[in-house]
Design a protein with these regions (language model features):
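A broad structural signal for alpha-helix termini and local helix breaks/kinks
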Residues: 42, 115-118, 170, 214
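Charged, low-complexity, helix/coiled-coil-prone segments
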Residues: 55, 99-109, 119-126, 140-154
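Membrane-interface interhelical connector segments
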Residues: 114-136
Length: 242
């Protein structure tokens, strides 16, 4: 009976992951095309403030709906999931998690030099940098997506759902690795690169450890936001420096 329940939980979790990924794409496409539609309808420049405002409003609405749906999924397995008052001892894990992510980046760079004798940038990162360099609406879209949308949605999918539906009763580390690898693959499947997979997977594992140690998803979300927020500063610098 226990094995049947575990299989049922796994299948349900897979369905929720697919739903989450689809909703993530809906946010990106919906916010992008809403901006394109309004600027074309008004006959104004693609970087017009009205277009950017519509894009942000649509992104906010779609993100709120997605967070509500995915939170419902997580709460079915972890009923106490919600925004709790931040505690100092648990907040420290945001710093630990960010340090682990930095360490993961260093390990990946070292592996690149050992096996390929050069440092390569993930295609996903290159695409974000190219969009950011365009400035205007593209820069706003990238920053909002990276700093706010991605941490909220991806943490609910890859930590909230996977760590609660996938082998929750198994060894502590087992679904942590699954969470990390699936998170990594999600970021490289369009243009697979082994070193990018390693880096994103290690980042995902770091975020999973934060969630498991604190038992509250707000801390892995905060860690994800911190990491992406700092990275976004360099994107903004590129945009204004180009």
């Amino acid at each position: 009976m226990k094995k049947i329940n575990q299989v049922g939980s796994l299948i349900t979790g897979i369905i929720w992951v697919v739903v989450g990924v689809i909703l993530d794409f809906v946010i990106q496409l919906g916010s992008t095309y809403s901006k394109v539609g309004i600027v074309n309808w008004l006959g104004v420049d693609k970087n017009h403030p009205i277009g950017i405002a519509v894009m942000l409003i649509v992104a906010a609405i779609l993100t709120a709906i997605t967070v509500w749906i995915l939170s419902y999924a997580v709460k079915r397995k972890a009923p106490k999931t919600s925004l709790h008052p931040f505690r100092g001892d648990k907040l420290a894990w945001v710093g630990y998690g960010y340090a682990m992510i930095l360490g993961a980046g260093m390990v990946t760079v070292a592996l690149q030099y050992v096996f390929s004798h050069q440092k390569m940038t993930a295609s996903n990162q290159v695409a974000l940098e190219e969009m950011a360099k365009k400035g205007g609406a593209a820069l706003v879209f990238v920053v909002v997506l990276a700093v706010f949308v991605a941490p909220l949605v991806e943490e609910l999918i890859f930590r909230g759902i996977i760590l609660n539906y996938f082998f929750k009763e198994g060894p502590w580390w087992f679904n942590v690795i699954i969470s990390g690898v699936l998170f990594g693959y999600f970021h490289v499947y369009q243009d697979f690169q082994i070193f990018a997979l390693i880096q994103y997977s290690l980042m995902g594992i770091s975020l999973a450890v934060v969630y498991k140690k604190t038992k509250q998803i707000q801390y892995s979300i905060a860690t994800h936001m911190l990491n992406n927020g700092i990275a976004a500063l360099s994107l903004i610098g590129m945009a204004f420096g180009s």
